[in-house]
Swiss-Prot record:
The lineage of its organism: Bacteria, Pseudomonadati, Pseudomonadota, Betaproteobacteria, Burkholderiales. Its EC number is 5.4.3.8. InterPro entries: 4pyrrol_synth_GluAld_NH2Trfase, Aminotrans_3, Aminotrans_3_PPA_site, PyrdxlP-dep_Trfase, PyrdxlP-dep_Trfase_major, PyrdxlP-dep_Trfase_small. It is found in: Cytoplasm. PANTHER family: GLUTAMATE-1-SEMIALDEHYDE 2,1-AMINOMUTASE (PTHR43713), GLUTAMATE-1-SEMIALDEHYDE 2,1-AMINOMUTASE 1, CHLOROPLASTIC-RELATED (PTHR43713:SF3). Its cofactor is pyridoxal 5'-phosphate. This is Glutamate-1-semialdehyde 2,1-aminomutase. Gene3D superfamilies: Aspartate Aminotransferase, domain 1, Type I PLP-dependent aspartate aminotransferase-like (Major domain). HAMAP family: HemL_aminotrans_3. The modification N6-(pyridoxal phosphate)lysine is found at residue 265. Belongs to the class-III pyridoxal-phosphate-dependent aminotransferase family. HemL subfamily. Its main location: cytoplasm.
Length: 427
């Protein structure tokens, strides 16, 4: 029995399912999860000492690679001064100033500890600001595990949303309307039917939790125009795509300003940190200035802020995103070429430092299209690549991530492994 198997059996005795987040359990792909012993640059090593090229990067944060020496040094410098204070620090101001500089639509920002906290707080703030209750979200977009966001579409536009998790009361789900991603007609119909009830529309402008699916410019511009017309708050959930698709995130890429933005992952540099921010007039409704309550014991934790601030400084290096975008595109295009050469139906896409792999004839534009991908073939490909020492997301419904440490040699090794994997799939 491998060390990974021993650890997984042991973990299941004290941790539900043996993991602290469901996707880590390998339920989608089968087999035994890899327990990570250490990581460096683009690699990690599991409990059995096997090395893997890592295309998860802690699900997005590790944009400069694992254990970057400057991030490590920044963390080490603050450790001796104390781990947590429950009081303000100058470093909190510095990271807030950096975020506001990089994302111009954010005039003020509040630090929290997780993406779920950020989206949950942004929705409460939008409701408090507008005095309305209804939230609009989109099928396939994931915004954390707050009750009002674990909702799927009802049988028709005007029906109540349905919970996607046990434990979510129908009375909460009924305030959330779920529409098809990238469907402008459905969006216009919804605003025409109940536009004056909508407190906020929350969207991943680049979705990463139904695999990688880009928002179309037409869809996102329609969102901006309709929210403005009807007085609804437009919330961009950039927890995943923020500082991933461009230095200024999806808002820079598309040239669209949100009213509120949720950030996470990269801004913590691998530490637990997230944030939400936006227009000053909306943020003024937050306590202690306004009546919308939000708080957190570990918000602005000095260790997380040190890692995040240094990461935000590193990604501003000249040419950083040009190189990262080109390398990610080289990976995606190379995988598609290897599949094509083997005669395996496959498509790939990339934007910035995010990529998507689809066992389908074309890149999907909605959750419904994503679900038509060949999941069984993806699962086989995942394990073939795992055996080769390449670690992709253990689910056909997750995006992948490239770091600045994924150099040409790493990409070459990945494509060589993929050539063998696709050949095995075609056999």
């Amino acid at each position: 029995m491998s060390n990974n198997q021993i650890l997984f059996e042991r973990a299941q005795k004290t941790i539900p399912g043996g993991v602290n987040s469901p996707v880590r359990a390998f339920r989608s792909v089968g087999g035994t999860p890899r327990f990570v012993a250490r990581a460096q640059g683009p690699y990690f090593w599991d409990a059995d000492g096997k090395q893997y090229i890592d295309y998860i990067g802690s699900w997005g944060p590790m944009i400069v690679g694992h254990v970057h020496p400057e991030v490590l040094a920044a963390v080490q410098r603050v450790l001796a001064d104390g781990f947590s204070f429950g009081a303000p620090t100058e470093a909190e101001i510095e990271i807030a100033e950096e975020i506001c500089k990089l994302v111009p639509s954010i005039e003020q920002v509040r630090m929290v500890s997780s993406g779920t906290e950020a989206t949950m707080s942004a929705l409460r703030l939008a409701r408090g600001f507008t005095g309305r209750s209804r939230i609009v979200k989109f099928e396939g977009c994931y915004h954390g595990h707050a009750d009002s966001l674990l909702v799927k579409a009802g049988s028709g536009l005007l029906t109540f949303g349905n919970p996607t998790s046990a434990g979510v009361p129908a009375d909460i789900a009924k305030h959330t309307t779920v529409l098809e991603y990238n469907n402008v007609a459905a969006l216009e119909e919804a605003f025409g039917a109940f536009g004056d009830e909508i407190a906020a529309v929350i969207v991943e402008p680049v979705a990463g939790n139904m695999n990688l699916v880009r928002g179309t410019p037409e869809f996102l511009n329609a969102l901006r125009a309709l929210c403005t017309k009807h007085g609804a708050v437009l919330i961009f959930d950039e927890v995943m795509c923020g500082f991933r698709v461009a230095l200024g995130g999806a808002q820079q890429h598309y040239g669209i300003a949100a009213d509120l933005t949720c950030l996470g992952k990269v801004i913590g540099g691998g530490m637990p940190a997230a944030a939400f921010g936006g227009r000053r007039d909306i943020m003024a409704h937050l306590a202690p200035l306004g009546g919308v309550y939000q708080a957190g014991t570990l918000s602005g934790n000095p260790i997380a802020v040190a890692a995040g601030l240094k990461t935000l400084q590193l990604i501003q290096a000249p040419g950083f995103y040009d190189a990262l975008t080109a390398q990610t595109k080289r990976l995606a295009d190379g995988l598609a070429a290897e599949a094509r050469a083997a005669g395996v139906p496959f498509a790939a896409d990339s934007i910035g430092a995010m990529f998507g792999l689809y066992f389908a004839e074309r890149v999907p534009a909605s959750f419904a299209e994503v679900t038509k991908s060949d999941v069984e073939r993806f699962n086989r490909f995942f394990h073939l690549m795992l055996d080769e020492g390449v670690y992709f997301a253990p689910s056909a419904y997750e995006a992948g991530f490239v770091s600045s440490t994924h150099d040409d040699a790493v990409i070459d090794a990945t494509l060589a492994a993929a050539r063998r994997a696709f050949a095995a799939l075609a056999a």
